[in-house]
């Protein structure tokens, strides 16, 4: 082969390689361009969907507020007002006043004061105030002192709060109230307040209270010497006694055996009450759900005990209990607008309170998503929608399941101990302290488990903490905290708007996001006890447990959320399965030590939903930001506010 031919072959060969290289480079460039375009389109789709969900969330909150307002005002037939009045005891009390159109100075109506229980507020009595006001009664639903929007006072006594009596004095001065027909009722601590009101009213020559319904508490059985008595005189008296009440209706029988609420009707206390204060020894046993009458001071009085087969906190969320309350006051006073006790509408209010809560969760997720598309916070947005990590080896899967199980186990075994410690401390809010200590403990355990996971497995398998969002520059972290605060503030703007225009809040049973007075903000430092857990939970949920285990992304989210809620599920399950099957609680109230274990178990009911949906919020915001701290801050602030505004605050 001559030199010319060889040179030609070399030229053609090199040209083909060069052309191939150029072609490959062009293909790669085109592929990268296509990938960027697809990522951008996916992010635009996320933005578009977030706008839609934001509108849906706002619409749900608005719809919920309108329906709630319509139900609690009986479609405009009842005027609802929020009052803040100075009591004769010198503190300011907050209350809702319901005035039916039929109640006037010319035609005064019977009035009923209703009270919530310990750690609750006036909004929790909605079944009572909705149903009683639609039947024509004037209703005053109060915030007890140290609760809700009422003043925090120095001499508050849990066993003898005077809120009910102060409310009785207030309604007795209203021109549209028939002062010969004033009734009182309260759930749990609210019934202690009712008994205190009876004692105060007994000192008056002209008594104001004509009827009292004790709800999930004990009536007065004995005098100061321990002898059976009828402290209520000629008043009509009823008792709603939950068959599985965790706190009341217990007694010691003749054999020295401590009996709990399931055996209440067999004891002397219940029988003495139904015999109007007589010693029931040797008398025929009287029955629940039967009205017994006796003439006292020339007037016929009634005593009755109702026994719904429910637990203590369910009674203020129960159609059966509501029907008993309606029926009792119908017997005592006669309703101005008689409606069958089973004809109830308060459930619609509660249902739409829950719709509003769903709308608020949608608002938080969608508003937070849209904020990272703004110029100020766009640096927090991920380059693409975050995808779950691949876990291909058996060890990785084992670490996933073991870490989730370990967290659930620690949360379960530590709960009662840590909450008890917090509740014994001399602080203004023992509930917030107890739950905060538990949250901190669980948060520290989560951090420890993540460190162990990273050192033993993640680091060896190329886990990049900066890439996952665990590590980030201080400026970006500060911006993340700021955005979290803004989202939480805007969520509460929605809550306050619903309260201002509609007297509505967003709740389901004992979980409630409600408006509050400015002084409550000084208790926000309790939030520092919650931040460790909710930030650590977000980091664990997204940076360590967001993977393909479970198949689809949403399945993985559900798995992680369910494991997070296990402590709040398993403890009540054990408590109530044991209670229903044996008639005694696994964790009973210890009066000697002051450790109220049944109360601590009840605190877990709203936490089930809090833990589940906070995990969902974590995941949704992480997928668009690759940043676990935004959602952690949002959840910590909201849970802290939810806790400090739905409890008892004392002076220490």
List each model region and its residues.
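Juxtamembrane interface at the cytosolic side of transmembrane helices
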Residues: 360-403
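Alpha-helical transmembrane segments of integral membrane proteins
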Residues: 398-652
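Acidic, Ala/Val/Gly-enriched low-complexity intrinsically disordered segments
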Residues: 5-10, 19-22, 38-41
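Short, positively charged and aromatic/hydrophobic N-terminal segments
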Residues: 10-17, 25-26, 31-34
């Amino acid at each position: 082969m001559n030199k010319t031919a060889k040179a030609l072959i070399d030229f053609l060969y090199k040209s083909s390689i060069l052309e191939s290289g150029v072609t490959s480079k062009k293909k790669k460039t085109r592929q990268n361009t296509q990938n960027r375009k697809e990522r951008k389109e996916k992010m635009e789709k996320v933005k578009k969907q977030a706008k839609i969900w934001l509108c849906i969330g706002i619409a749900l909150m608005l719809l919920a507020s309108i329906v709630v307002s319509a139900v609690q005002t009986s479609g405009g037939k009842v005027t609802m007002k929020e009052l803040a009045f100075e009591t004769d005891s010198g503190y300011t009390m907050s209350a809702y006043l319901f005035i039916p159109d039929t109640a006037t100075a010319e035609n005064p109506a019977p009035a009923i004061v209703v009270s919530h229980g310990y750690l609750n507020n006036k909004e929790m009595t909605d079944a009572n105030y909705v149903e009683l006001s639609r039947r024509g009664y004037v209703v005053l639903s109060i915030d007890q002192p140290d609760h809700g929007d009422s003043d925090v006072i120095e001499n508050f006594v849990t066993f003898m709060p005077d809120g009910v009596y102060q409310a009785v004095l207030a309604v007795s001065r209203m021109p549209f109230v028939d002062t010969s027909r004033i009734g009182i009722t309260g759930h749990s601590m609210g019934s202690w307040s009712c008994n205190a009101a009876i004692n105060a009213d007994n000192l008056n020559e002209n008594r104001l209270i004509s009827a009292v319904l004790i709800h999930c508490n004990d009536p007065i059985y004995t005098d100061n010497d321990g002898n059976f008595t009828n402290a209520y005189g000629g008043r009509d008296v009823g008792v709603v006694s939950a068959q599985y009440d965790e706190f009341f209706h217990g007694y010691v029988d003749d054999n020295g055996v401590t009996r709990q609420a399931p055996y209440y009707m067999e004891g002397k206390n219940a029988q003495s009450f139904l015999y109007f204060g007589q010693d029931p020894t040797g008398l025929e046993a009287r029955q629940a759900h039967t009205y017994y009458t006796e003439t006292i001071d020339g007037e016929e009085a009634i005593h009755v005990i109702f026994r719904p087969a429910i637990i203590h906190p369910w009674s203020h969320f129960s159609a059966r209990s509501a029907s008993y309350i309606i029926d009792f006051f119908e017997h005592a006073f006669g309703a101005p607008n008689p409606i069958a006790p089973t004809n109830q509408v308060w459930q619609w209010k509660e249902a739409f309170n829950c719709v509003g809560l769903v709308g608020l969760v949608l608002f938080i997720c969608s508003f937070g998503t849209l904020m990272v598309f703004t110029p100020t916070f766009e640096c927090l947005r991920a380059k693409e929608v975050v995808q779950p990590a691949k876990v291909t080896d058996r060890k990785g899967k084992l670490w996933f399941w073991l870490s989730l199980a370990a967290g659930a186990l620690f949360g379960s075994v530590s709960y009662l101990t840590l909450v008890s410690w917090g509740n014994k401390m001399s602080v203004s809010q023992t509930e917030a302290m107890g739950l905060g200590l538990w949250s901190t403990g669980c948060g520290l355990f989560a951090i420890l488990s993540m460190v162990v996971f990273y050192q033993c497995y993640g680091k060896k398998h190329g886990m990049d903490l900066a890439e996952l969002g665990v590590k980030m520059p201080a400026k970006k972290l500060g911006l993340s905290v700021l955005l979290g605060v803004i989202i939480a503030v805007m969520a509460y703007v929605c809550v306050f708007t619903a309260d201002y225009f509609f007297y509505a809040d967003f709740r389901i049973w004992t979980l409630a996001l409600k408006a509050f007075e400015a002084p409550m903000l000084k208790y926000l430092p309790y939030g520092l006890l919650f931040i460790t857990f909710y930030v650590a939970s977000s980091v664990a949920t997204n940076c360590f447990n967001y993977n393909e285990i479970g198949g689809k992304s949403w399945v993985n989210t559900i798995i992680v959320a369910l494991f997070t809620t296990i402590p709040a599920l398993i403890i009540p399950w054990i408590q109530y399965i044991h209670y229903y099957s044996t008639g005694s609680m696994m964790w009973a109230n210890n009066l000697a030590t002051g450790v109220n274990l049944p109360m601590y178990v009840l605190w877990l009911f709203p936490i089930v939903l809090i833990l589940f949906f906070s995990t969902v919020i974590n995941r949704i915001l992480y997928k668009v930001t690759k940043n676990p701290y935004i959602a952690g801050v949002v959840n910590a602030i909201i849970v802290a506010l939810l806790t400090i505004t739905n409890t008892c605050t004392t002076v220490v």
